[in-house]
């Protein structure tokens, strides 16, 4: 399913989701916690691709919930590299949620998850995974920076400029044509 995930074949992705759901029934969280957490992480990855393809926020939210559930089983103390992998998956799911909702708090949380994974990968010499996660973190932080750069900050002069209800009666066309509309003007016309 990895190639199909990259290509985004929705039918294959739906089959993969169903397979993961069936596997969760066989590998119970309490009887087979390690296998169950692997299934949950795989499910989260598939849900990310599918949710992004069909632009479904609820599917992406299920991806996040799958990661969080897996993180209750895999901890940094008991399975650090697997925990970091789930953190990376969580970061990706949160990144996509931010992309599809415009809620940049998800992007901040995404960066936190990537940083947590990167720390563990660094401590355990997992260079290849650290490289992947570092690229994810850079992309997440770039998106946050771009979003903050796009926020409009009014110039100083605009902060004191107030439009009021009485401004709708102002003759903007006359103003733009050079007529101030002010008959009591002290300015004399030069002929």
Set out the residue ranges of the language-model regions.
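Short coil/turn connectors between adjacent alpha-helices in alpha-solenoid helical repeat scaffolds
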Residues: 1-15, 48-61, 96-109, 143-152
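Conserved alpha-helical positions within TPR/SEL1-like repeat arrays
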Residues: 1-5, 34-49, 81-96, 128-142
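Short coil/turn linkers that connect adjacent helices within long alpha-helical scaffolds
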Residues: 6-7, 29-32, 53, 73-79, ...
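Amphipathic alpha-helical segments of tetratricopeptide repeats
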Residues: 20-28, 64-73, 112-120
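Boundary/linker segments of alpha-helical solenoid repeat arrays
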Residues: 31-32, 78-79, 118-119, 123-133, ...
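Alpha-helical adaptor scaffolds
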Residues: 34, 45, 49, 53-82
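TPR/TPR-like (Sel1-like) alpha-helical repeat modules
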Residues: 65, 104-125, 138, 151-162
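Terminal, low-structured helical/coil segments at or just beyond the last alpha-helical repeat
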Residues: 129-191
